[in-house]
Amino acid sequence: MTMTDPVADMLTRLRNANSAYHDTVSMPSSKLKTRVAEILKAEGYIQDWREEEAEVGKKLTIDLKFGPQRERAIAGLRRISKPGLRVYAKSTNLPHVLGGLGIAILSTSSGLLTNQQAAKKGVGGEVLAYVW
């Protein structure tokens, strides 16, 4: 069965594993999900990610990050642009998440970028998700 919104599925799996204090979470892999995982690692929200061979296709495994007393590195995730309602932002009107404490992940003509990277490059795009 095909998945309607793979990014929402990824964010939901991350949110559920994070709230249950799981150390890792696995999901079907794609280029888009891999790029989202790269951004989350670069911004310090996850410890690491890897792509593994599965019975069918590839599997993306993400190692979640916790503090010394098991504090969650990811406080929240929200899918913004959905298949039924796409949300776009111009380069002059990029979103700020929690006053700059969180990140927005955008799909731009330059690939997937955070709101800060998109502002530096002067590009806008589709707002995929907020992470804080």
Curated annotation (Swiss-Prot):
Pfam families: Ribosomal_S8 (PF00410). InterPro entries: Ribosomal_uS8, Ribosomal_uS8_CS, Ribosomal_uS8_sf. PROSITE patterns: RIBOSOMAL_S8. Keywords: Ribonucleoprotein, Ribosomal protein, RNA-binding, rRNA-binding. One of its GO terms (molecular function) is structural constituent of ribosome. One of its GO terms (biological process) is translation. One of its GO terms (cellular component) is ribosome. Part of the 30S ribosomal subunit. Contacts proteins S5 and S12. One of the primary rRNA binding proteins, it binds directly to 16S rRNA central domain where it helps coordinate assembly of the platform of the 30S subunit. NCBIfam families: PRK00136.1. PANTHER family: 40S RIBOSOMAL PROTEIN S15A. Belongs to the universal ribosomal protein uS8 family. This is Small ribosomal subunit protein uS8. It comes from Micrococcus luteus (strain ATCC 4698 / DSM 20030 / JCM 1464 / CCM 169 / CCUG 5858 / IAM 1056 / NBRC 3333 / NCIMB 9278 / NCTC 2665 / VKM Ac-2230) (Micrococcus lysodeikticus). The gene is rpsH.
